[in-house]
């Protein structure tokens, strides 16, 4: 049974604005970067229609200093409310004599030290060390700390943007040109505020396809170009064959400095990605398939609120794996899904009691909770598994016809779960009885794992499990003569990830690797390529396995490596593990490298340690 709201799409509870009173036609956003003060000033103009004849405009803000506000060129009084979890309301009075409904609302503001959307890096925290660097991350509700706005995915409009900076700059739009230190961009496709992005620093670019370039610090330009140029256009063409023509003109990627704490962000026209994708073996570039898929799911068709985040991420993971299937075969698609299923199990288990709230597909944020609190693997993996299940019931050939229909229907729009389901039932009217077999109540509202597990092709994962089991049983006997480097010679990086994850998981049972150091040392001798790997996903797990087994020579190796990455996926569990085996060493390396980390990353590591101390 569906718990339908009275109106769809339902209102976004994570904005303080009165966005429902206005139609936003266009936004002009002009930014200026001050690297001396680590501040960004903004002038934003919203062209709107006052559809309800309201007497005030209420915008979202957070940690901003508001300098002025005007409507249709007339200076207007404004009020900034006290900050709460979701920020501070900015209320601008519409002059009573202003009877027209077409308004241009202009606000000048400046960020503060507490801005959650921006990260300023000193030169020493960049890879090249030439100068400072700035990048933004506005998802989910951090755009309001960069400029006042209707900060909700329910509001989408075209943008004209500029940034003035002493260093080369990019934004989430099509480059229009440079005038002195001013870089101008246009985004004609309607986007929500969370997709506004800016980066500025020692940035160069190189082509990686007929409609793609990679941007990064000059020091890494050649290796980044090599990593992406063989696959980028293939990804684009595979995605277009699934949905429809790519609408954003260019698909570029910005590889950020090592201190970037995230995996990637699907900013339109220029995806921001972690440098840990650059492995030298092109094994991690499949991550680009995910960010590219966002060009349709999330960017073109958007969840109306963060309660329905699975519509963005579930669809994106589904499309990502379909792209991989087209390029590498269905066994690869299912292999990725199996890894995702395991990640989902681990994620829900790690939630503890909070899984009762945060492991359901449709969230309830109506109590004013921060959407970041709800962030997990659930919308990605549980959402994509639901779509896989629907595809299985309907049949892939028939479901493939629904994909472009869905994205055409909601193109440029924001929707909720119920509109998706209505669209599904409308398109498959002849399959109503089949769709009715889906336990929508459990899929959407019940916590825990999905009610149905697809019948995945396990051929690629079976090899990993079999080798791991072999090591387990031979470790018990202390006999290792049957292993050689040939065991893993044909493994992809992801297969090595599964193999190592399986070995690590054994330690959670009665078996403990610290009692089998001979096995770990033999493994290091036989599989020498793991210690030499440039693939962050593989190398991290290799270190985790060895340190979990109290192989002390790897403690300092892990500690030094944590100084070369800033991605929280590795940094947080890396320090937690090091802290468990040698707290003084963990503190030493954190003190040595903490200035290289993002502020959020530093605070999360400290929080992790506090949790450990209070257990």
UniProtKB/Swiss-Prot annotation:
Ligand binding (Zn(2+)): 290, 294, 313
Superkingdom, according to UniProt? Eukaryota
Q: Which reaction does it catalyse?
A: an epoxide + H2O = an ethanediol
Transmembrane feature ranges: none
An example GO biological process term is: peptide catabolic process
**What's in the keyword line of the UniProt record?**
Cytoplasm, Hydrolase, Metal-binding, Metalloprotease, Nucleus, Protease, Zinc
List locations, semicolon-separated.
Cytoplasm; Nucleus
In alphabetical order, the GO MF annotations are: aminopeptidase activity; epoxide hydrolase activity; metallopeptidase activity; zinc ion binding
Q: How is the cofactor bound?
A: Binds 1 zinc ion per subunit.
Chain residues that bind substrate = 137-139, 261-266
Q: Which is an annotated Pfam family here?
A: Leuk-A4-hydro_C
Active site at 291, 380
State the family named in the UniProt similarity comment for this chain: Belongs to the peptidase M1 family.
This protein is called Leucine aminopeptidase 2-1
Species lineage? Eukaryota, Fungi, Dikarya, Ascomycota, Saccharomycotina
